[in-house]
């Protein structure tokens, strides 16, 4: 009898043994040994191991390891079969479910789409069998795995687990997820922080005022607002990036009840002083980093309490605004054929911030009390208004007569956003040009999509120059398609570890140093090449 026939015979004996199946240990051991056999033997072993697993508890560890061996076989078909059969080990066995969940979590880093789909299917299957034990395996990898594994696990939770509905995500399970994600926040990279806050926002925390307050508290703790000074900010891009990430995570939850005062005060005190402002991100895309900072600042400022030292803080906004409001040319001849050049997106944010703070602190606008400063400010406003109105006219002419389909093109979408930006600037200038300024108009920031979209959409920054009239952007300007850096934008490589002093000096290579037990695959590099997952 050859090995294949012997395997079928063992299967037949075990299937027909009934209550006496536990007496047939030798037959089950023979099936386990088949994981070292030919391809066909391995595929049969994968199918048979799980069928009889629960009847041989003394061989549980051996059986699980045998199945795991098949999950890392050189043959793709055998790996897929073994991954598909893993859920059979989990029926009524919490310990096995945790181990299988841990293994499948590690396999989320697979690149082959067919294999990865099978991993997802098997994970979803065991989650339906025993939700808590399954996701305990996921959180083991979030705690001890390498960076890629951690990120894939968090993405799985955000995009698949939390969409499984209340029959799976019960109150107990949701509480467990919240507790474990909070633990994970103790040591996260920038991308992991974003994923963790996305997950928490999709739980009960995202739907109640008390939950919003807790989310803001978590973001505030990560931002470490009291632990940075101007000298550090000037030389360390990570500090600014950390603030932008944390402020962006908190921004959707600020309201009349939950105030953004601490974040706004931090921007005014630590980031907007001119010396510091001009040093921000000098080694990378400075305009883009500064614009991202200004956007989140503008989003937060509406929900600020009365500021202490309001005059000094408003003056910090005013001084940076002047950087984006050039003085007018001496005469029309000086202009020649070159239109004035403005960074409208930056100007919108700063004008809105000044307008909002001025409305809340009308007696703290120190430049209004200085005749020379007020004259200078009004001259700059008038010059900006001139450039804005000229740009609005060209944009309106460019968009006139366009069909609905034509307006959906990227170029025309950009022009429409530019029109919103410049229209907002025009409205704000009208109020601020009064002597003294008035604050009667309210606007919606150009990149915010009101209703049903807390976070809003970010659009490309806008400049005014030779190419602007044609396509709504400077010839050297690339659209800012995301509100935070991605692998494509390469504004900045986030460092390893928590947003604190635990920064790996070689963070530019995206390595991660962790003082943890274990690791995603039994080694500092995750061990993927030698072994895809940990054995117990």
Swiss-Prot record:
Protein name: Apoptosis inhibitor 5 homolog
Gene ablation phenotype (knockout): Enhanced E2f1-induced apoptosis.
Record has Nucleus as a keyword: yes
Polar residues bias (residue ranges): 498-507
GO molecular function term, any single one: RNA binding
Disordered: annotated span: 462-536
GO cellular component, one term: nucleus
GO biological process: apoptotic process; negative regulation of apoptotic process
Composition-biased stretches (Gly residues): 516-528
Species the sequence originates in: Drosophila melanogaster (Fruit fly)
Key words, A-Z: Apoptosis, Nucleus
Subcellular location: Nucleus
Regions of compositional bias (Basic and acidic residues) in chain numbering: 472-487
Family: Belongs to the API5 family.
InterPro entries per UniProt: API5 (IPR008383), ARM-like (IPR011989), ARM-type_fold (IPR016024)
Role of this protein: Antiapoptotic factor. Also known to efficiently suppress E2F1-induced apoptosis.
Keyword Nucleus: yes
């Amino acid at each position: 009898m050859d090995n294949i026939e012997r395997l079928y015979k063992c299967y037949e004996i075990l299937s027909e043994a009934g209550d006496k199946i536990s007496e047939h240990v030798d037959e089950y051991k023979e099936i386990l040994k088949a994981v070292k056999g030919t391809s066909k033997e391995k595929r049969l072993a994968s199918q048979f191991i799980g069928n009889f697993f629960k009847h041989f508890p003394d061989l549980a560890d051996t059986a699980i390891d045998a199945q795991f061996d098949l999950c890392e076989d050189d043959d793709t078909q055998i790996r897929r079969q073994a991954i598909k059969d893993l859920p059979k080990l989990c029926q009524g066995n919490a310990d096995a479910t945790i181990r299988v969940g841990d293994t499948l979590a590690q396999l989320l880093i697979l690149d082959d789409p067919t294999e990865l789909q099978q991993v997802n299917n098997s994970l979803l299957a065991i989650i339906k069998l025993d939700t808590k034990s399954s996701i305990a395996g996921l959180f083991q990898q979030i705690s001890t795995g390498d960076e890629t594994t951690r990120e894939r696990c968090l993405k799985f939770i955000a995009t698949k687990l939390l969409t499984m509905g209340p029959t799976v995500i019960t109150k107990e399970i949701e509480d467990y997820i919240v507790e474990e994600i909070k633990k994970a926040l103790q040591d996260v990279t920038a991308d992991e922080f974003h994923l963790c806050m996305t997950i928490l926002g999709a739980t009960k925390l995202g739907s109640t005022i008390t939950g919003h307050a807790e989310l803001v508290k978590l973001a505030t703790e990560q931002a470490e607002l009291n632990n940075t000074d101007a000298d550090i900010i000037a030389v360390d891009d990570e500090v600014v990036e950390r603030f932008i990430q944390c402020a962006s995570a908190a921004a959707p939850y600020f309201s009349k009840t939950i105030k953004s005062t601490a974040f706004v005060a931090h921007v005014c005190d630590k980031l907007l002083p001119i010396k510091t402002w001009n040093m921000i991100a000098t080694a990378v895309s400075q305009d883009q980093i500064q614009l991202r900072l200004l956007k989140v600042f503008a989003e937060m400022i509406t929900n600020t309490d009365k500021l202490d030292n309001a005059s000094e803080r408003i003056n910090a906004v005013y001084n940076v605004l002047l950087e984006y409001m050039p003085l007018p040319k001496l005469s029309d001849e000086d202009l020649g054929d070159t239109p004035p050049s403005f960074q409208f997106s930056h100007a919108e944010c700063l004008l809105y911030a000044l307008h909002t703070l001025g409305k809340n602190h009308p007696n703290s606008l120190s430049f209004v009390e200085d005749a020379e400063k007020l004259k200078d400010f009004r001259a700059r406003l008038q010059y900006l208004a001139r450039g804005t109105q000229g740009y609005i006219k060209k944009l309106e002419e460019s968009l006139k007569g366009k069909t609905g389909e034509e307006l959906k093109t990227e170029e025309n979408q950009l022009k429409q956003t530019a029109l919103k930006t410049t229209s907002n600037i025009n409205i704000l200038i009208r109020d601020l040009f009064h002597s003294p300024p008035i604050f009667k108009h309210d606007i919606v920031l150009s990149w915010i999509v009101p209703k049903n979209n807390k976070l809003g959409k970010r659009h490309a920054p806008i400049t005014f120059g030779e190419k602007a009239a044609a396509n709504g952007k400077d010839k050297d300007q690339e659209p800012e398609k995301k509100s935070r850096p991605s692998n494509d934008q390469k504004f900045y490589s986030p460092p390893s570890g928590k947003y604190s002093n635990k920064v790996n000096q070689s963070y530019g290579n995206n390595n991660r140093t962790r003082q943890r037990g274990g690791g995603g695959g039994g080694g500092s590099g995750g061990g993927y090449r030698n072994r895809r997952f940990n054995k117990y």
